[in-house]
């Protein structure tokens, strides 16, 4: 169903310029192509003028206590802290809440960054539900060959450390 302005949902597209499928990957094609529409895996919304805004990847969204928390929103709040050089936000399993928001932060050189300080800072910007419950300080974030942060590696590392 088409959502109203400002309502967030998965972006789906169709047309002559949309891929007919993933190269040699029938399963991914079947998952993305449903009812003649290509499901992008992106969450977004249309504004009142019909402009499309991408909010996050659906797979990066954290569902905690019934609330949808977009990792990009939390990352943008973290990046406002002067001691944060880079960051990534993931969801980890939580018995009570389903998932909990967890951040991995790379500090600015020469900064003595503390977990409690970062959590308190973010809480003032986006509220307690979206604020990371844990902040891990890492010297570097894992990246792909093209420089993209590998959130799957972060989740695997943090999940294995439990």
Where in this protein do the model-derived segments appear?
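Flexible coil/turn and secondary-structure edge motifs
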Residues: 159-162
């Amino acid at each position: 169903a088409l959502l109203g302005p400002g309502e967030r949902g998965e972006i789906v597209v169709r047309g002559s310029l949309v891929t007919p499928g993933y190269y040699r990957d029938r399963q991914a094609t079947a998952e993305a192509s449903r009812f003649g529409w290509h499901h992008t895996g992106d969450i977004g919304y249309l504004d009142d003028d019909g402009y499309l805004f991408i909010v996050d990847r659906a797979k990066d969204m954290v569902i905690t206590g019934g609330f949808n928390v977009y990792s990009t929103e939390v990352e943008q709040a973290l990046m406002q802290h002067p001691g944060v050089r880079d960051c990534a936000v993931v969801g980890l399993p939580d018995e009570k809440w389903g998932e909990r928001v967890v951040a991995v932060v790379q500090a600015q050189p020469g900064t003595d960054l503390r977990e409690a300080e970062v959590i308190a800072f973010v809480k003032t910007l986006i509220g307690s539900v979206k604020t990371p419950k844990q902040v891990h300080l890492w010297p570097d974030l894992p990246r792909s060959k093209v420089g993209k942060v590998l959130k799957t590696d972060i989740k695997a590392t943090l999940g294995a450390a439990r």
